[in-house]
């Protein structure tokens, strides 16, 4: 490995998350490689990153006062999603029941959590369960944005209903990363999909297969939902309207799961509100529909299903913009991501020589 991996790498790093990580992001041309890069542990994969997909969790955890630094470390490189090429693999313990990846193989995937050594760097170490071969014919750059939102959308829909055909799903927020994948996945499973978005994104959501689109700029989302047949599942990708969950009994069937994916901010009030939704008895003012905050678990088989759909043309990544590694590209990328107005995903091209 010593002959193929340099002693240092280029990486975007921040040492403070106040007021934001992008206000402190700097390109380090001589950053150390991830810990263990030359001595990989069991089921670890060293990846030379071609592109990184950005997610709000990249900055939301890091920006939690005091706690963020403990979770992520400092200095830190943000980013969890990637597309790249395998450099080396650690011993395979067979805990992941798949074939070994080979050096040189193109892969996409995600890290398990925000890390000091994230994916906005030339090299990253991924868990084997979070790394899968890129299917033939897929655009490598686009696969960089699939793992987190694709897996979130897949598990929030596929795992929550036993029988999907004909089931009615409401996806709150259809034009972002999770929403664009969620619409397509729900349709693949045979569901009837209603989603919400702003006026400029209505046509996008319809083009992805949404049966009904609520324009929240023109109408009240909850009022519109109450006029429709009751839903069997709600996936909330945005966290607004803030009273959407409490209104759910008026537009969902009894027992319909409510899956919280997105939130405006992780605040003490948000955490307390979630406690009442999840734990407080309904007869004492708590939630009257099963509520959970979405937690995804990397699963090679799920990634492979997403890859098959992409290969078959049944699932596509909606990419808002691809930024470069140089000239403050990542800074501008996070600034745009933070607006919440991106159509689909934002990608940073780490290897700027790569062409699909």
Swiss-Prot record:
Matches recorded under SUPFAM superfamilies: GroES-like, NAD(P)-binding Rossmann-fold domains
Record: residues binding NADP(+): 57-60, 175-178, 198-201, 216, 261-262, 342-343
Induction: Expression is significantly up-regulated at the end of late growth phase, in the presence of Butyrolactone I. Expression is positively regulated by the pgm cluster-specific transcription factor pgmR.
Keywords carried by this UniProt record: NADP, Nucleotide-binding, Oxidoreductase
Coiled coil: none
InterPro entries tied to this protein: ADH-like_N, GroES-like_sf, NAD(P)-bd_dom_sf, PKS_ER, YIM1/Zinc_Alcohol_DH_Fams
Keyword Heme listed: no
Function, as annotated: FAD-linked oxidoreductase; part of the gene cluster that mediates the biosynthesis of pleosporalin A, ascomycone A, as well as a third cryptic naphthoquinone derived pigment, all responsible for the coloration of conidia. The pathway begins with the biosynthesis of the cyclized heptaketide 3-acetonyl-1,6,8-trihydroxy-2-naphthaldehyde by the NR-PKS pgmA.
Family: Belongs to the zinc-containing alcohol dehydrogenase family.
Name of this chain's protein: Trans-enoyl reductase pgmF
Organism: Aspergillus terreus
Gene: pgmF
